[in-house]
């Protein structure tokens, strides 16, 4: 199935373009999720194609999507990684970038704490935390513009459940990789804020959508987007991180 996915992605015209046919662009989403998909399959099946894909995705993120001039990882770039200076091209999705950071840190751990990957994952985490953490109200906001222009998406300053779960995981991996107490402090910061705002204290489960100030935007516990994935994954990955909290020599 994984090989079929790669074949579909590599076959021109087989899948509808994510962006307009007249706009040649690369997307961060498929690039980063293939790291995690290959990693999960590799835990059960050994196949060189999995390591190859992980290497290719990490190289693409470094080459195309990381933009030091903005200290940001962009969601959409030109074919050579150039900035597409439009509303969509300038978008930073902090939660998505933080998720990428822990995918890379997890791979660094798999490689006995590969220093280059640790450095890369930490850099993405720190960039994305700076863009995403709301210094006034707390929590990770949805979207930013790399030039600090107004963001087009109407939910840009809301707090969705899943960016918080990714930040909880990423900060634990960062602490595990470095033993730097600041990442443990960041973990406590995001964890405390998340558990103070998202769980329904009367009936259980989490709300999915908060206003910027942390009040509930709508009370649904699940919909076509919010399913039983990000929260249990956060709990499982955090538990496994806590089983071992010191980096390899």
Describe the function of each predicted region.
Residues 1-62:
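Aromatic- and glycine-enriched pocket-lining scaffold segments that form the walls
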Residues 26-42, 91-109, 157-176, 225-239:
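Well-ordered alpha-helical segments within folded domains of soluble proteins
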Residues 1-14, 54-72, 121-136, 186-203:
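Long, well-ordered core segments of solenoidal/helical folds
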Residues 244-249:
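Conserved small/polar residues in nucleotide/adenosyl-binding loops
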């Amino acid at each position: 199935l994984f090989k079929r996915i790669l074949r579909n992605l590599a076959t021109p015209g087989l899948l509808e373009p994510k962006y307009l046919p007249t706009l040649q662009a690369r997307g961060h989403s498929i690039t980063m999720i293939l790291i995690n998909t290959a990693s999960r399959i590799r835990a059960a099946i050994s196949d060189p194609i999995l390591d190859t894909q992980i290497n290719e995705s990490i190289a693409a993120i470094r080459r195309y999507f990381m933009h030091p001039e903005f200290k940001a990882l962009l969601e959409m770039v030109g074919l050579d990684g150039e900035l597409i200076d439009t509303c969509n091209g300038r978008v930073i999705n902090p939660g998505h970038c933080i998720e990428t950071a822990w995918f890379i840190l997890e791979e660094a751990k798999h490689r006995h704490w590969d220093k280059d990957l640790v450095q890369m994952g930490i850099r993405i985490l720190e960039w994305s935390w700076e863009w995403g953490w709301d210094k006034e109200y707390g929590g990770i906001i949805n979207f930013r513009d790399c030039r600090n222009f107004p963001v087009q998406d109407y939910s840009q300053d809301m707090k969705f459940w899943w960016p918080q779960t990714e930040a909880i995981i990423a900060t634990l991996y960062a602490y595990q990789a470095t033993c730097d107490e600041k990442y443990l402090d960041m973990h406590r910061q995001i964890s405390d804020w998340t558990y103070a705002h998202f769980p329904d204290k009367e009936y259980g489960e989490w709300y999915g959508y908060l206003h910027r100030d942390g009040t509930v935007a709508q009370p649904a516990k699940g919909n076509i987007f919010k399913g039983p994935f990000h929260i249990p994954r956060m709990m499982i990955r955090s538990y496994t991180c806590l089983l071992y909290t010191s980096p390899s020599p």
